[in-house]
Amino acid sequence: MMVEKRHEQLGLNEETVLDMYRTMLLSRRIDERMWLLNRSGKIPFVISCQGQEAAQVGAAFALDRQKDYVLPYYRDVGVVLTFGMTAKDLMLSGFAKEEDPNSGGRQMPGHFGQKENRIVTGSSPVTTQVPHAVGIALAGKMEGKDLVTFVTFGEGSSNQGDFHEGANFAGVHKLPVIFMCENNKYAISVPIEKQLSCENVSDRAIGYGMPGITVDGNDPLEVYEAVKEAADRARRGEGPTLIETVSYRLTPHSSDDDDRSYRTADEVAEAKTKDSIKTFGAYLKETGIMDDALEKQMNDEVMIIVNEATDYAENAPYPKAESAMNHVYAQK
């Protein structure tokens, strides 16, 4: 039976969709390694992307990596890898080493930032990145620049004031912002049905005068299509879009959480049957783009990258104690 080549309908060639899969795979393997390092006492904290790689990579591939700004939230390994960060960068951050590009070993893992690639630094209070994304979009519009800002957050963050204030301002001023809510069903331990009185996070868009769409967060092609359309709309001066990607958080909230206290093993096992690493891999095989040999080759190549990044970061120097106050204030 012939399988519909959906990627071709989106203007994506085989090389691009393989690159998407490779980036998803790298995200997963980095994340899995971080958990092993944490459990062996080598790094202090992990906050996971597992289960959300398809949404992150599909979205990031739909943006212009030469001029758009991304304001990722703490799970967005797939976004930052697509925009130019490396496995080595992320490992240096995990180990809090001097070369950590996010903060020189000062920030917690998951607080991504890399000025050269327009990855804007985030802070620990959730949703603070949303007003920043709106501000960058406002500046871009005032200066006549062709840029879009892309900001992500969890469905729990969509209940914070920063989201509503940012969305309202962007809607009123028709700013080129893409708000992407990565709905992974849980705000730490609070399930989605105890967070919303409406059916979908995207239903909130109408109150701010923007389109809202809910898509399958396990399908990178569906997410790509939605984000590409939102980016095109923003560049035409038609304003912001709210996109909700629905997936499932496959790990505990963080390395400090025990998810067995609020969800069942059967629920997690059911979600793993829809894991995008498996389902997108199956699509690539069904369309003849990837076979078992290529899949093994890609896995092997990714593991070499992860192993080299781990070894480098583990052996890299820590920041010097006398540098502790650097970068607290602006420096000449």
State each model region's role.
Residues 1-55, 61-62, 251, 257-260, ...:
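Conserved acidic/glycine
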Residues 3-7, 28, 64, 102-106, ...:
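N-proximal short alpha-helices
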Residues 7, 32, 40-42, 86, ...:
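Residue-level signal for pocket-adjacent positions within structured domains
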Residues 22, 66-68, 108, 177, ...:
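A generic secondary-structure signal marking the coil-to-beta-strand transition
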Residues 32, 36-173, 191-197, 202, ...:
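Cofactor-binding active-site loop characterized by glycine-rich and histidine/acidic residues
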Residues 74, 245-247, 328:
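A general secondary-structure junction signal
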Residues 118-315:
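Glycine-rich ThDP/TPP pyrophosphate-binding loop and its adjacent helix/strand module
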